[in-house]
From Swiss-Prot:
Taxonomy, superkingdom: Eukaryota
Stored PANTHER family: C-TERMINAL-BINDING PROTEIN, C-TERMINAL-BINDING PROTEIN 2
Region (Disordered): 414-445
Quaternary assembly: Interacts with HIPK2 and PNN. Interacts with the transcription factors ZNF217, BKLF, delta EF1/AREB6/ZEB, EVI-1 and Friend of GATA (FOG) via the consensus motif P-X-[DNS]-L-[STVA]. Also interacts with the C-terminus of adenovirus E1A protein. Can form a complex with BKLF on a CACCC-box oligonucleotide. Can form homodimers or heterodimers of CTBP1 and CTBP2. Interacts with NRIP1 and WIZ. Interacts with PRDM16; represses white adipose tissue (WAT)-specific genes expression. Interacts with MCRIP1.
Chief localisation class: nucleus
Residues modified as Phosphoserine: 428
Upper lineage: Eukaryota, Metazoa, Chordata, Craniata, Vertebrata
Cellular component terms per the entry's GO annotation: cytosol; GABA-ergic synapse; glutamatergic synapse; nucleus; photoreceptor ribbon synapse; presynaptic active zone cytoplasmic component; presynaptic cytosol; ribbon synapse
Localization per record: Nucleus; Synapse
Role of this protein: Corepressor targeting diverse transcription regulators. Isoform 2 probably acts as a scaffold for specialized synapses. Functions in brown adipose tissue (BAT) differentiation.
UniProt protein name: C-terminal-binding protein 2
GO BP annotations, alphabetical order: cellular response to leukemia inhibitory factor; negative regulation of DNA-templated transcription; positive regulation of retinoic acid receptor signaling pathway; positive regulation of transcription by RNA polymerase II; synaptic vesicle docking; white fat cell differentiation
Length: 445
């Protein structure tokens, strides 16, 4: 009996676990703090206060996927990105620990969401991002085409004398009345609806085509719905695009569809550059089939008038993918993206994510499977980080000491502020959470 007592090990109380000793991580080494990286930017001042108690935040400022640092490829659990780089399957396979990508914006055509899902990487967006700004910019482009303010300004800058009625008629040739014109919207999501409300105030008759939208919305907004793209093109004096880009609508506006438009119609695109065949558009502008076009997005970005099919196209207004931008919109988008990353760290992927766009492709990877309930006591709820290849148990008394994340070529990011534990109300691994899915239909522009 004495021999048994000699080798008998007293079970440690659960509340003593946190006293300088961390629970063992299952299936992998201990990772003190997950790494979250901003891939194509360098300003983390908005994101860091939201994530500083959970993760080390760093940036790459990459202009291409080849510039993403090896440390990020090997260690980053979460990534945030704008629209300036593209992640293909080959690029996604280079990430060793990545579990969630948040696109700071509404469009996600620059990420292979199917490949990401198959690799166990959730992709999220901010569907409400910059709706007001994009709608305002779209209406500005429409008004500019009708009232020709840009061309009138250029004429004065070039020294054109405008005094007599004949001179006014010559320099303002092409200006048209707005009231009574028909504006056709392709895609009637958040931005499309915001444009419709604004356009009606200027006297437009608004019609829209959106095969994904349920019936009834047209009645509440006082607009007319058409059920084929051909009908919309045939009836519209001005066509504006408000749909996401996918494999089904690439070059939606091409030589064939342009010929279905009214002679001398206008075209506006502040959605995605790939929706318009720029070669066909340039030819239509030169021939006068399209009276004028305004583009905020382009097939190849950054856009330059010095090259590409549109360099010699007349009656064309181009802006550098800035329709979405305002200080307020940028702040809101970044806060929403960081908050989504926080949900991913503290909850389950993809169940805890509010705006995951690739759930149908998502495959739960083995290292991130449901935690054995015997491994985590209920008192530690909210203090467990799901970090591959295992689980990091964090004491309720606090997180590990602050770490410094340095990405060569960027500014060192140091966390000196005291850290605190997760809120106790954070969802446990097997606790169901409510989430919203913004993919009711693809036309959320």
């Amino acid at each position: 009996m004495a021999l048994v007592d000699k080798h008998k090990v007293k079970r440690q109380r659960l509340d003593r676990i946190c006293e300088g000793i961390r629970p063992q991580i299952m299936n992998g080494p201990l990772h003190p703090r997950p790494l979250v990286a901003l891939l194509d930017g360098r300003d983390c001042t908005v994101e860091m206060p939201i994530l500083k108690d959970l993760a080390t935040v760093a940036f790459c400022d990459a202009q291409s996927t080849q510039e993403i640092h090896e440390k990020v490829l090997n260690e980053a659990v979460g990534a945030m990105m704008y629209h300036t780089i593209t992640l293909t399957r080959e690029d996604l396979e280079k990430f060793k620990a990545l579990r969630v990508i948040v696109r700071i914006g509404s469009g996600y055509d620059n990420v292979d969401i199917k490949a990401a899902g198959e690799l166990g990487i959730a992709v999220c967006n901010i569907p409400s991002a910059a709706v007001e700004e994009t709608a305002d910019s779209t209406v500005c482009h429409i008004l500019n085409l009708y009232r020709r303010n840009t061309w009138l300004y250029q004429a004065l800058r070039e020294g054109t004398r405008v005094q007599s009625v004949e001179q006014i008629r010559e320099v303002a040739s092409g200006a048209a009345r707005i009231r009574g014109e028909t504006l056709g919207l392709i895609g009637f999501g958040r931005t499309g609806q915001a444009v419709a409300v604004r356009a009606k105030a200027f006297g437009f008759s608004v019609i829209f085509y959106d095969p994904y939208l349920q019936d009834g919305i047209e009645r509440s907004l006082g607009v007319q719905r058409v059920y084929t793209l051909q009908d919309l093109l045939y009836q519209s004096d001005c066509v504006s695009l408000h749909c996401n880009l996918n494999e089904h609508n690439h070059h939606l506006i091409n030589d064939f569809t342009i010929k279905q438009m009214r002679q001398g119609a206008f075209l506006v695109n502040a959605a995605r550059g790939g929706l318009v065949d720029e070669k066909a558009l340039a030819q239509a502008l030169k021939e006068g089939r399209i009276r004028g076009a305004a583009l905020d997005v382009h097939e190849s970005e950054p856009f330059s008038f010095a090259q590409g099919p549109l360099k010699d196209a007349p009656n064309l207004i181009c802006t550098p993918h800035t329709a979405w931008y305002s200080e307020q919109a940028s702040l809101e988008m970044r806060e929403a993206a960081a908050t989504e990353i926080r949900r991913a760290i503290t909850g389950r992927i993809p169940e805890s994510l509010r705006n995951c766009v690739n759930k149908e492709f998502f495959v739960t990877s083995a290292p991130w499977s449901v935690i054995d309930q015997q491994a985590i006591h209920p008192e530690l709820n909210g203090a467990t980080y799901r970090y591959p290849p295992g689980i990091v148990g964090v004491a309720p008394g606090g997180l590990p000491p602050a770490m410094e994340g340095i990405i060569p070529g960027g500014i060192p990011v140091t966390h000196n502020l005291p850290t605190v534990a997760h809120p106790s109300q954070a969802p446990s691994p097997n606790q169901p959470t409510k989430h919203g899915d913004n993919r009711e239909h693809p036309n959320e522009q």
